């Protein structure tokens, strides 16, 4: 859907010739006058934003670039140049405040900006605490004025991408109630997220109040005049303005002064604020809940991540192993933490499970959750936690916290609130890794339409297309590394951790109807995938909060916070679909939070939201049947034997030791084990709600032809009884 949305942006209405239009959006600035705010103190002077640097003809040009995604190729196109016309010079009420654009602060400097976000983006601030002077519609109300909120495909519905004041509103304002006295230190703004329109504020003032009736403004140190803060020059880039002096108040207002000509005063915002102690405040909210686990709750760049993983390995050397599956385009290693009672060894009958995070580098919560999970498992194992001990003794857990470390480093440098919605999403080749796996859906569906599945074309372990294996194929090194990893280890269960929504999506991710934007496209194992998705969603505290509002433009709670991926938006080349069709592994996508890159003060609560879900999901690998397929004569396991379940058109295969795991929901199943050179065997296997997979072992007997091949290959003579049997089978007499 993102590709469709971005492509449609090319057909958006042309932007007017001038930026920075004030108040009623008429070219030039109105004379300074009185700002009448209901219940406010009198007379605040308007101040125009400082005009941009002039070119030779008296105008300033800004090049806006948008990303157009066509199929799998990422193409960068230049939009039409936008001309900034210098407004008529007027005496301002005070000097313009210098903005702090995204990306200008190093991580260490970011800590000095003072306060963390109040919680507009993370939804910690409820809709009832957001107000405005006016709104164009309900879908453009103040509850939509949250940093990084995304609109739906259509404007004018209930889910538009900003707060927008009415055109007739002469003195627009957007107000946030912190709930109690708070130290405000800064403001971050964006324009309107829309496929069809360009709207953003170019300058604004800030006011404060303790009772929402008496207001005072933020002032410059040098002049003592009201400060005018320069805002945005495009819809998406977050712009941070630190206040000249932090202010303690309960309410904060943003008053747009100028905005894009031809547009409307529209903005999305986040407020930087610190709580303050006030013994007279009788309505103090309960402190934000966190976690009592002794874990490292902060964001980790590549160097810090390596250091943390090494510390965990040194603390728990008997249950951990760190290994690399390859390198990113920039040469950063893709590190995996393996956790098991026998790390580095595949034990017969012990399933392999994995979590993958950071496929999109700017979706940072999954990365931190996996780093927290490995710390937690180590800590609890040392404490003798029986649940953790059982997990580590019954399965091998593989944690890949950063599949796209290059993208993450870009996002980390920008900072959690300034990275925006998409920067750092792609790898350094501008490849979206979740569209980069081989499309195996199309050849499977074409073969099904021709009646070739499963007799001619298998319904599992589909081979890579020839084009995908060519040296010049557009396949990211990160993708190649993960595919090799999938082939090397017999994974059974996986989850791909993303961010930006609160929902669990399951395969298929790609619609069966070509070019359909969305369409319900279930797999043959739809019941299993729905179960897995429901287990995670039902164990996630945030997803189960019935009082929470939707993140952006869809309310997934009406479906239990799960959805078929293709019925949400089509994703050709997804890792989920590839994992299901190329390996034995069942994988879902978990969208962990409305905020892709939450501030680190949100991490303790996000850990509590997901801790039980992460553990419970891993335990689902016990659901279904498991066993070993052995050779009757040698009693050795048979590798690559096929396990077929009657009524489910998708098979799995045995690992190199002959062991297998087949995820199934409770019920009775007729299961067939077959292997080349062996007679097939079918038996009934019952799956119940009891813990642990139902043991369903098979012993296969070689066919006479296979026995003959093996004898001849060994140079032995064919026994008379076998020779006579073969001749009888051929219809010949001795």
Curated annotation (Swiss-Prot):
Disulfide cross-links: 115-274
A GO cellular component annotation in the UniProt record: extracellular space
Disordered: annotated span: 30-62
Its EC number(s): 3.4.17.-
Record's keyword terms, sorted: Carboxypeptidase, Disulfide bond, Glycoprotein, Hydrolase, Metal-binding, Metalloprotease, Protease, Secreted, Signal, Zinc
GO biological process: proteolysis
Pfam annotation, one family: F5_F8_type_C
Signal peptide interval: 1-20
Residues of this chain annotated as glycosylated in UniProt: 57, 210, 220, 318, 428, 472
Cofactor(s) in the UniProt record: Zn(2+)
Glycoprotein is among the record's keywords: yes
Main location: secreted
PROSITE patterns in UniProt: CARBOXYPEPT_ZN_1, CARBOXYPEPT_ZN_2, FA58C_3, PEPTIDASE_M14
InterPro entries membership: CarboxyPept-like_regulatory, FA58C, Galactose-bd-like_sf, Peptidase_M14, Peptidase_M14_domain
Cofactor note (record): Binds 1 zinc ion per subunit.
Transmembrane parts of this sequence: none
Family per record: Belongs to the peptidase M14 family.
Function: May be involved in cell-cell interactions. No carboxypeptidase activity was found yet.
Protein name: Probable carboxypeptidase X1
Species name: Homo sapiens (Human)
